[in-house]
């Protein structure tokens, strides 16, 4: 089944909903481009229609498009080879760049679209930001940069471009889009159901369309009760989740099951990819892999940009999409296998993340998404050494775990010595903990011993002294435990202060 966000993508700017001022400013930029030759930045939250507007504008102007998105590597060399060639040289139609506003040259231009311009960084995109800045200054073709956060872009790039903000799409603008899709698909609807979908997506038009498609899969109507408004309270196991997606549940139900599993979307996608062949018929597999390919694109964007809001689109495809590819429910028992391409480093990552989650009192997903990247950053290549030792001791990491977190070689003397020192630190802390636990008993015994030569009065003064010592020891131990419990209360920050 076709992805509705693509099937109903606006073909002209007049069809772009919810951002009339931005749409008009964008059209003005295009019509006057020959006068200013400036690139433009379309910025705003994911799913508000920035990329769709760029393609719609190209249709309106009769321009061809060249697109480089966040799942592509965007080094200086790549940008020059793809976008630079299109921007500086002849168009595919054979016309020279830089023609006048009148005549056929304008219609034969190419619109260069660079997605996620605010997330070009690191070795993966080495030199990309400076190459784009140079490109927009010298371009002979119109360039559109797409960004979520305008101020995450380099200042030089901001200064060299115009900017147009696309705001979150209001629920009252989303509902008509959903209504039009229902009518074109022959789906009867309750207005309250569409309003609930629109409100739940909080300005994300793309997400609302995905939710509508999931909720109506295999149906010819949608009512309020068909729209699930919240996540399930009870965590779902991995194998029940696979049953839900591959055998039992509707697209909407499978999507909610995905939200209830304590795993990240990239791991869930790997499990689905590895097991779908064992459950689906050939025709179903073909449809399922179309959705899995879309999920991989979104996961690529997450890896390239570290923008985890894109995870929801990967989940939409890997869960709801794959479930929608199935013809009815399936019975029987299936031996689900771990992904065959799960490398030793993946296994190490699972073990490390599991230990972090257990020690910190947070979920596996939080440990993988928030705590692990922090640890990797502050202990890169085992520096500073003292902090790395403390981290390894806090999370009970062996040499393989230390090497994985720090990005160092497992067989190096550096990692081995850190593992030894971490073990020594753990033992030292265990001794200190044991001494604290028995300190009260020792104090009580000392006090009782000291009172042997004294006359105990009727009120039991000596015994009271012993009781005071016992109470003091207990208070110290309980205070430590209470602090540990407080660290675990905040799932998002659990574990980060354990050793810093």
From Swiss-Prot:
Cite the binding residues for ATP: 44-51
Looking up InterPro entries in the UniProt record yields:
AAA+_ATPase, ATPase_AAA_core, P-loop_NTPase, Rep_factor-C_lsu, RFC_lid
Region of interest (Disordered), residue spans: 443-500
Q: Where is the composition biased (Acidic residues)?
A: 467-492
> In the UniProt record, does the keyword ATP-binding occur?
yes
Q: Which residues form a coiled coil?
A: none
* GO MF term (any one): ATP binding
Asked whether the UniProt record includes Ligase among its keywords, one would answer no
Q: Where are the transmembrane segments?
A: none
Task: Report biased composition (Low complexity) as residue ranges.
Answer: 455-466
Which Pfam family, any one of them, does this sequence belong to?
Answer: RCF1-5-like_lid
Which key words are in the record? ATP-binding, DNA replication, Nucleotide-binding
According to its UniProt entry, the protein's GO biological process terms are: DNA replication
Subunit field text: Heteromultimer composed of small subunits (RfcS) and large subunits (RfcL).
Query: Hey, which family's this protein in?
Result: Belongs to the activator 1 small subunits family. RfcL subfamily.
Which function does this protein serve?
Part of the RFC clamp loader complex which loads the PCNA sliding clamp onto DNA.
Cross-referenced NCBIfam families: PRK04195.1-4, PRK04195.1-5
PANTHER family, per the entry: CHROMOSOME TRANSMISSION FIDELITY FACTOR 18 (PTHR23389), REPLICATION FACTOR C SUBUNIT 1 (PTHR23389:SF6)
Q: Write down what this protein is called.
A: Replication factor C large subunit
What would be the name of the gene that encodes this protein?
Answer: rfcL
């Amino acid at each position: 089944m076709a992805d509705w966000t693509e099937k109903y993508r606006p073909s002209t700017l007049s069809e772009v909903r919810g951002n009339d001022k931005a749409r008009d400013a964008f059209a003005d930029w295009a019509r006057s481009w020959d006068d200013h030759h400036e690139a433009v930045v379309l910025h705003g939250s994911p799913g508000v229609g920035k990329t769709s507007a760029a393609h719609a504008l190209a249709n309106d102007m009769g321009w061809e498009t060249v697109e480089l998105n966040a799942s592509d590597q965007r080094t200086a060399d790549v940008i020059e080879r793809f976008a630079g060639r299109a921007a500086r040289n002849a168009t595919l139609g054979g016309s020279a760049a830089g023609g006048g506003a009148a005549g056929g040259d304008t219609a034969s231009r190419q619109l260069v679209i660079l997605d996620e311009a605010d997330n070009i960084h690191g070795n993966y995109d080495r030199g990309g930001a400076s190459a784009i800045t140079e490109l927009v200054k010298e371009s002979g073709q119109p360039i559109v940069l797409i960004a979520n956060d305008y101020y995450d872009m380099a200042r030089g790039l901001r200064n060299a471009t115009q900017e147009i903000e696309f705001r979150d799409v209001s629920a009252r603008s989303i509902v008509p889009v959903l209504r039009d899709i229902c009518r074109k698909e022959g789906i009867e609807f309750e207005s309250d159901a569409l309003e609930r979908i629109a409100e739940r997506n909080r300005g994300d038009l793309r997400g609302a369309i995905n939710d509508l498609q999931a909720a109506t899969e295999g149906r010819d109507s949608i009512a309020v009760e068909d729209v699930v408004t919240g996540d399930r309270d009870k965590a779902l196991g991995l194998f029940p989740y696979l049953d839900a997606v591959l055998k039992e549940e509707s697209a909407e139900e499978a999507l909610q099951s995905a939200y209830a599993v304590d795993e990240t979307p990239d791991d869930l996608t790997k499990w689905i990819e590895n097991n779908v062949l064992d459950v689906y018929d050939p025709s179903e597999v073909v449809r399922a892999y179309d959705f899995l390919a879309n999920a991989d694109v979104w996961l690529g964007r997450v890896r390239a940009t570290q923008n985890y809001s894109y995870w929801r689109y990967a989940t939409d495809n890997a869960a709801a999409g794959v479930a929608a590819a199935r013809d009815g429910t399936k019975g029987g028992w299936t031996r689900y296998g771990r992904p065959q391409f799960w490398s030793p480093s993946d296994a190490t990552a699972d073990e490390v993340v599991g230990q972090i989650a257990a020690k910190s009192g947070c979920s596996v997903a939080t440990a993988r998404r928030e705590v692990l990247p922090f640890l990797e950053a502050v202990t890169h290549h085992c520096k500073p050494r003292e902090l790395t030792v403390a981290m390894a001791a806090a999370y009970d990491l062996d040499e393989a775990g230390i090497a994985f977190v720090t990005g160092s070689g497992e067989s190096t003397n550096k990692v081995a010595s850190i593992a030894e020192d971490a073990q020594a630190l753990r033992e030292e802390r265990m001794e200190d903990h044991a001494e604290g636990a028995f300190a009260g008993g020792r104090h009580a015994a000392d006090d009782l011993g000291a009172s042997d030569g004294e006359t105990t009065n009727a009120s039991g003064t000596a015994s009271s002294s012993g009781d005071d010592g016992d109470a003091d020891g207990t208070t110290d131990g309980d205070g430590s435990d209470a602090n540990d419990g407080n660290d675990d209360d905040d799932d998002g920050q659990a574990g980060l202060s354990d050793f810093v």
